[in-house]
A protein has these predicted regions:
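Acidic, low-complexity proline/glycine-rich segments
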Residues: 38-55, 136-157, 189-194
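Active-site-adjacent "gating/activation" loops or surface patches in catalytic cores
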Residues: 127-168, 256, 310
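Extended, charged alpha-helical coiled-coil/arm scaffolds that mediate oligomerization and mechanical coupling
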Residues: 54-87, 93
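Active-site-proximal, well-structured secondary-structure segments within enzyme catalytic domains
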Residues: 52-53, 81-84, 91, 95-136, ...
Length: 314
């Protein structure tokens, strides 16, 4: 993972919020789009062209083009602050992830883990001039422990550390706490929505989406939950029964991944680790790009020379 300061610079380069806001509030450009929409030429546009024009005009309005000057300025301030808070949230989560680690010197603690995972942990320890293995909250390390580690206490410890990152709970409680950041984001999003004439941020968000209202979204989700719950309950009951057979009468959150993998191996004689060999990154990307080309006629070629915040970026 890149150091936070490098990640921050990269993120700000990718999010030119002030430019986007100024562009969206450019009256001359908006008037030009309106004139085009009212022109005889626009009447002969095909569906795609008309949609692009409609969306452009919509986006101007969602940038506050119709607001009085003072409210336009406030809109710009809120957008800038939201960008800053979004970056701070990501950076604090990254810092919290990197702040926790567990140094292991007894290999039996890692019983059940694949050799590839242990090798990564050994490399992480060596990078810090430590003997043995270093477990971190980076996802490959976390996933390996939660899926394969036989040591239930280790899974619980890691689960608690991972799920409480950047919060007022857990082993690093209060450090890099994102709670206040989230509250500020919620408050500013509400203000932004009201500036643009919406009751709440959910309605503002839906202005650019297919769903017509937040009630429609909630209705869809509730219906999906109603249809899915019986199947999820069945799977959970089977997992609990299997865990009980293996000596775990009370299935906890940090047990689900471990016993789920064990049950999968028992039923299908295959493990996630074994499947990895068939899906190297280059093969996966090649397959994905091939599908895109067949479906949409788009050819994707890799750019070899470019500036990035980390050498692994492609």
């Amino acid at each position: 993972t890149a150091p936070t300061e490098i990640y921050t610079l990269s993120l700000h380069d990718a999010l030119p919020i002030s430019y986007s806001t100024e562009l969206g509030q450019n009256r001359a450009l908006f008037d030009a789009y309106q004139a085009l929409a009212a022109s005889p030429e626009a009447a002969s546009f095909d569906v795609a062209q008309k949609t692009i024009l409609e969306h452009a005009l919509r986006d101007f309005r969602l940038s506050g083009i119709d607001l009085p000057a003072a409210e336009q300025q406030r809109y710009a301030e809120v957008q800038s602050k939201l960008s800053e808070l979004g970056s701070r949230f990501s950076n604090q989560l990254l810092d919290a992830t990197q702040a926790w680690s567990k140094h292991v010197t007894d290999e039996t603690t890692l019983d059940g883990l694949p050799d590839s995972a242990k090798a990564q942990m050994a490399a992480a320890a060596a990078a810090k001039d430590l003997e043995g293995w270093l477990i971190t909250l980076e996802f490959p390390s976390y996933y390996a422990v939660m899926t394969y580690a036989s040591d239930r206490a280790l899974r619980e410890e890691l689960y608690a550390a991972y799920c409480t990152r950047a919060s007022d709970q857990g082993p690093n409680a209060g450090q890099f706490d994102n709670g206040p950041v989230m509250q500020q984001i919620l408050d500013l999003r509400q203000e932004l929505a009201e500036l643009l004439g919406y009751k709440n941020y959910a309605e503002l968000s839906l202005a650019t989406k297919m769903a017509e209202s937040s009630d429609q979204v909630l209705s869809f989700l509730r219906d999906l939950a109603k249809r899915s719950k019986p199947f999820a309950a069945r799977d959970l009951a089977q997992l609990k029964a299997y865990a009980a057979e293996q000596g775990c009468p009370e299935l906890a959150s940090w047990d689900a991944g471990y016993f789920g993998e064990k049950l999968r191996e028992q039923r299908y004689s295959v493990s996630q680790e074994a499947l990895r060999a068939y899906f190297p990154i280059d093969k996966v990307l090649g397959g994905l790009f091939s599908i895109v080309q067949r479906l949409y006629g788009i050819e994707i070629n890799e750019l070899k020379q470019f500036d990035a915040w980390h050498p692994d970026v492609r």
